[in-house]
Amino acid sequence: KFHWGTDSGDGFENSIYGPYLLNDARTGVHADYDRFVLEFEPDISEPDGSPDSFHVFWADGTPLSMGSGNPISVTGNNALEVFVLGYGYSRDELAEPSQAPQSLSPTRTGNLKQAVWDGEFEGVLHWVLGVKEKVDFRVLSIPNPPRLVVDVCRTSSG
């Protein structure tokens, strides 16, 4: 059973797994909610691990870029900020960037209008979700492969 609310709480304090390398980002549509998924490369030393260090909350005003402090513009009337411990670049010698999309503009979702990746700053990934209506959401951390899922209600009634 999962709790729907307006703040995920701060998951950074109790980290067990990760950080993981971002592999993909995508959106999905369900009957009562829109879904945003961050998928990470599995960690062979922790095969059942999942991203457990995150903080998701409604932005108070215009979201700001972690590194520069510049405003981040998204489509929608409200912004939901997603911070998760993770890497945007491999930790190999060549430091290859993640192949995940930088921006998503779903067309079938009811409330979620856009997702923009601000990048990685000091091992923290920052995404901003532009939504039409400020509603309840839930956050799920799922293993195999490691994923962080943000489900945003389609309307305030559910």
Residue ranges and their predicted role:
Residues 1-158:
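Short linear recognition/processing motifs and adjacent strand/loop elements at protein termini
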